[in-house]
Amino acid sequence: MSEPRKILVTSALPYANGSIHLGHMLEYIQTDMWVRFQKMRGNQAIYVCADDAHGSAIMLRAEREGITSEQLIDAVRAEHMGDFADFLVDFDNYHSTHSEENRELSSAIYLKLREAGHIDTRPVTQYFDPDKQMFLADRFIKGTCPKCGTADQYGDNCEACGATYAPTELKDPKSAISGATPVLKESLHYFFKLPDFEAMLKQWTRSGALQESVANKLAEWLDSGLQQWDISRDAPYFGFEIPDAPGKYFYVWLDAPIGYMASFRNLCARRPELDFDAFWGKDSGAELYHFIGKDIVNFHALFWPAMLEGAGYRKPTALNVHGYLTVNGQKMSKSRGTFVKARTYLDHLDPEYLRYYYASKLGRGVEDLDLNLEDFVQKVNSDLVGKVVNIASRCAGFIHKGNAGVLVGADPAPELLAAFREAAPGIAEAYEARDFNRAMREIMALADRANAWIAEQAPWALAKQEGQQDKVQAVCGLGINLFRQLVIFLKPVLPKLAAAAEAFLNVAPLTWADHQTLLANHQLNPFQPLMTRIEPAKVEAMIEASKEDLAAAAASQPAGNGELVKEPIAAEIDFDAFAAVDLRIALIEKCEFVEGADKLLRLSLDIGDAKRNVFSGIKSAYPDPSALEGRLTLYVANLAPRKMKFGVSEGMVLAAGPGGEEIYLLSPDSGAKPGQRVK
């Protein structure tokens, strides 16, 4: 028998500035299922995580709420831990990056990098808010795009035209925090010399540690040459002060991944059998896996392994990267009620419904996953209630009535039982590869075969026939054993159902190896319902409650929504100036990603009697570009064409919103036609 594997697993650290939602839960459920599978196989799998608890955003929110940053992160951490526990995510340790372990490790790693010559310093000129007396990160500066003239754009890129620029290039810059006009001020910054590790990273990213599509994307960065990474922020800042640099703090993305190490070290202090260096040392034979979303690949696949290499630690065995969550084919929306918080879901529905649905859709790739709510109801009701639980509910009553609850050891269908046993290695292989959807398909195919066989044997009919009691018990006994096999295969996904099934079966917690054995002449406990069907009305109630969450949040704000404060109405223009802008209705015929562009989508537009090609910086809000195809939008037709490195953009489509995921492409009422002028 082979030695148990030593495996350390992490999920990305949720930011301690807001609630967990169903998009977040995709990653934690995925990770938890994989870790539970490893533990069932007898491996030493350890799952650690923590709240990402540093940064200006946390400091500013705490200030607005009149509490300390420590009070804020403690409250958010408690909320996060409650949500995860109720979703059956079983961390071995859940810590915080604002911890002594993380302070010590961050300082030690920095000092090792400095000693090895991988730290540089140089003055940086950046915007400073004179009212708040703080330097402003790019996202805290708003102004007019220097390229296309669109107002209310962030300090590093324009969501309208996709241009990137330095914050100092913005026209009419304003602090997004105070509204003050920022001033330029020089400050000494600390940099990590990422280019020192370029050769290592080129080799490591092609070593099999990454999915191929992720490695290909990173190759673009590596081929264009790496830049030094700014790892410092100036006071005031909520975080750890850099050693020997008063008033300078580690940038949150330096100490956040070190939080993985800190959480594990915190666990080691409570579990003496665990050796920190055995998992993190340069020559560690343990496996280390990070489950992350595709939006934070650069930090984990470039900066993080370079930091570990430079400080004398081991690198990850692999990064397991997943895509985004959409709901009903579109990005999560607060107004539609599909931006669902974890707690709102839990108030209405069983967490195992979602765990199973995610498992049925998750593959090993980085494709986005769509939570289609109608399909969700149908799949859970059909697969879990109609197939798996149905086997036990069909058979248990006959065993209790006809044999005092004792399951006999007969095997009336050896070929069927053999099929279940022979399927186990393939299902295990799918779990190991994170092909959860394949595992679920194979498990449900077995459930179909079991149900078909039981229906064919019809124990309910046999029970009415004289002298058929032995056959009834044999059929139902095998039915319960097949149900037990399915429970073993589903246990990583459905731990609560498995625990209830174990109680009914009157057995110790099931391991993966138990699929090789059968129950025989075994006393069962009385059967209790294991799972109920999803009621569509409860899904609707969850959606309505999510809309109410939005309304409550809006009601707690001051009168008005603050948009005019953030972006005051521009200087008055005359009608001729407005009339000079030729706005048209455009039909989006095709919408696609732009290779090599992080923020742009390419839109092919029909404007009635002509076609136009437009690049728009709306990718972050529309992870599925095809969802925009066939939609009407507003188009600036007489904007001068702009040559970009990806091609020529012939105009601009109009959108509202602050940016990021909150970009809303404008559409006319139904009945408008491509080419019509907007007046």
Swiss-Prot record:
Which residues are the signal sequence here?
A: none
Q: Where in the cell is it found?
A: Cytoplasm
Residue numbers binding ATP: K334
The short motif 'KMSKS' region is annotated over 331-335
GO MF terms held by the record: ATP binding; metal ion binding; methionine-tRNA ligase activity; tRNA binding
- Which Gene Ontology cellular-component terms appear in the entry? cytosol
Q: Which residues form the tRNA-binding domain?
A: 577-679
EC class name? ligase
Q: Which SUPFAM superfamilies match?
A: Anticodon-binding domain of a subclass of class I aminoacyl-tRNA synthetases (SSF47323), Methionyl-tRNA synthetase (MetRS), Zn-domain (SSF57770), Nucleic acid-binding proteins (SSF50249), Nucleotidylyl transferase (SSF52374)
Needed co-factor(s):
Zn(2+)
Q: How is the cofactor bound?
A: Binds 1 zinc ion per subunit.
Which PROSITE patterns would you find in this protein's record? AA_TRNA_LIGASE_I (PS00178), TRBD (PS50886)
**What family does the database annotate?**
Belongs to the class-I aminoacyl-tRNA synthetase family. MetG type 1 subfamily.
Q: Which HAMAP family match?
A: Met_tRNA_synth_type1
- What quaternary arrangement does the UniProt entry report? Homodimer.
Listed name of the protein: Methionine--tRNA ligase
Organism for this UniProt entry: Pseudomonas paraeruginosa (strain DSM 24068 / PA7)
Taxonomically, what lineage is the organism?
Bacteria, Pseudomonadati, Pseudomonadota, Gammaproteobacteria, Pseudomonadales
